[in-house]
Regions:
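Loop-to-transmembrane helix entry/capping segments in MFS-fold secondary transporters
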Residues: 82-83, 169-184
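Short amphipathic helix-loop junctions that connect adjacent transmembrane helices
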Residues: 68-85
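C-terminal membrane-cytosol helix-exit motif in multi-pass small-molecule transporters
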Residues: 5-25, 237-245
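A membrane-interface helix-boundary motif in multi-pass transporters
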Residues: 1-5, 201-233
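Helix-to-loop junctions at the C-terminal end of transmembrane segments
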Residues: 98-115
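Intracellular juxtamembrane helix-capping segments at the cytosolic ends
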Residues: 156-170
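C-terminal ends and interior cores of transmembrane alpha-helices
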Residues: 122-138
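Juxtamembrane intracellular "pre-TM" segments in multi-pass secondary transporters
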Residues: 20-53, 256-266
């Protein structure tokens, strides 16, 4: 515990290095500032803002809903040991780290971030297909592949949507753009994680009690129900983000000379 506290202190001190300097000429009390409502109205009048936020919310929810049920699924349905289920988290994190590297490579080449985000959603569809079919095939390896691809697809989607937000013509409202991204991302993620657990519990209770029919009397039914919802949410994400790819035909100018994990606020 003391080691964690000391590490946190050191990391916070390091984070203060090169912190953005104050700009009194922009933050003085004498400068007239519009209300949040006026600022948001101006910001939302950009044609693709609301569609972007809807796509972000759907995609984030799709990748987050499985967060607290992935390991129990491996243990309860596939009979994995405690150590084997712990590895699932490592696989998901490894997939996300690999996605960050891939995103850095292609975004620095000015690839359309919306297109890359849609590719992340496609990987998510493949991931949940692997997870869903791992139960009838009794294949822990297929399940592990699904866990890895969830991290990879989610990583691509998160970084790409953040880069897209940073590339908005915000007219001096960069903080609002990133704040909107963070608010939608955090809200969608929190609601989805909670909903995933509740849906799994409710459906599992109904299924094991026989209220859903004899064919669905299985411990896997509740989990499968959640994974199918995520599957459909990813299709909805593709529908929402598709027009953004069309609207953004020209390559997006790279918004930063560097790309790293420090650019991902969550």
């Amino acid at each position: 515990m003391q080691g964690v506290a000391a590490t946190t202190l050191v990391l916070n001190l390091i984070a203060a290095w090169k912190q953005e300097a104050r700009q009194p000429h922009l933050t003085a009390h004498s400068i007239p500032t519009p209300s949040f409502k006026e600022t948001w109205t101006t910001f939302s009048q950009q044609g693709k803002v609301m569609r972007f936020l809807v796509a972000l919310g759907l995609g984030t929810a799709a990748f987050s809903m499985q967060d607290i049920i992935l390991e129990p699924y491996g243990a309860e349905v596939l009979g994995l040991s405690v150590s084997a289920t712990t590895v699932l988290t490592s696989l998901t994190s490894l997939g996300a780290l690999l996605a960050f590297g891939v995103a850095a490579r292609y975004l620095n080449r000015s690839i359309d971030p919306y297109r890359l985000a849609s590719i992340g959603a496609l990987f998510g569809i493949l991931a949940f297909s692997c997870v869903i079919f791992s139960e009838p095939l009794l294949s822990p390896m297929l399940f592990r592949c699904g866990a890895f691809l969830i991290g990879f697809g989610g990583g691509l989607f998160s970084v790409s949507t953040l880069t897209a937000a940073m590339s908005f013509e915000s007219g001096g409202m960069n903080g609002l753009v990133l704040g909107a991204w963070g608010a939608v991302h955090a809200t969608a993620s929190g609601i989805a994680i909670a909903a995933g657990g509740v849906i799994r519990d409710v459906i599992s209770t109904l299924a094991t009690s026989g209220l859903l029919g004899e064919g669905l009397i299985s411990t896997a039914t509740g989990y499968s129900f959640v994974y199918h919802i995520e599957f459909y949410l990813l299709f909805a994400t593709l529908i929402a983000i598709g027009p953004l790819v069309v609207m953004n035909k020209h390559a997006v100018m790279n918004v930063s000379k560097k790309f790293g994990l420090d650019e991902l606020p969550s």
